[in-house]
Amino acid sequence: MNIRPLHDRVIVKRLEEERKTASGIVIPDTAAEKPDQGEIIAVGKGKAGEDGKIRTLEVKVGDKVLFGKYAGQAVKIKGEEFLVMREEDIMGVIEG
């Protein structure tokens, strides 16, 4: 990937959800909701605080995260879709 986020922004690749129900019914793309989980692909250097010092981000590359349904700006890079969002749009890190 050839994109480097600036400041407190991160690049997230959505994690694909199961397209089949427990009973075996296949959910078409048009009816499926977009997943609200993703993996951090790249992180910016951080945001300057009021004192002028850069506050590094809490998330790191490889973290699995939760975010809001409408968080981020979708971008396509080499045919793959990613989200660019601010760290504050991330609700939590999935651990374990």
Swiss-Prot record:
Matches recorded under CDD domains: cpn10 (cd00320)
UniProt record, GO biological process = chaperone cofactor-dependent protein refolding
GO CC entries: cytoplasm
Q: Which UniProt keywords apply?
A: Chaperone, Cytoplasm
* Signal sequence region: none
Question: What GO molecular function annotations does the UniProt record carry, in alphabetical order?
Answer: ATP binding; metal ion binding; protein folding chaperone; protein-folding chaperone binding; unfolded protein binding
UniProt xrefs under Gene3D superfamilies: GroES chaperonin
The record's listing under InterPro entries reads: Chaperonin_GroES (IPR020818), Chaperonin_GroES_sf (IPR037124), Chaprnonin_Cpn10_CS (IPR018369), GroES-like_sf (IPR011032)
Compartments (UniProt record): Cytoplasm
Function summary: Together with the chaperonin GroEL, plays an essential role in assisting protein folding. The GroEL-GroES system forms a nano-cage that allows encapsulation of the non-native substrate proteins and provides a physical environment optimized to promote and accelerate protein folding. GroES binds to the apical surface of the GroEL ring, thereby capping the opening of the GroEL channel.
HAMAP family in UniProt: CH10
- Name the family the entry cites: Belongs to the GroES chaperonin family.
Task: Kindly state the subunit structure of this protein.
Answer: Heptamer of 7 subunits arranged in a ring. Interacts with the chaperonin GroEL.
Kindly provide the name given to this protein in its UniProt entry: Co-chaperonin GroES
The UniProt gene name for this protein comes to groES
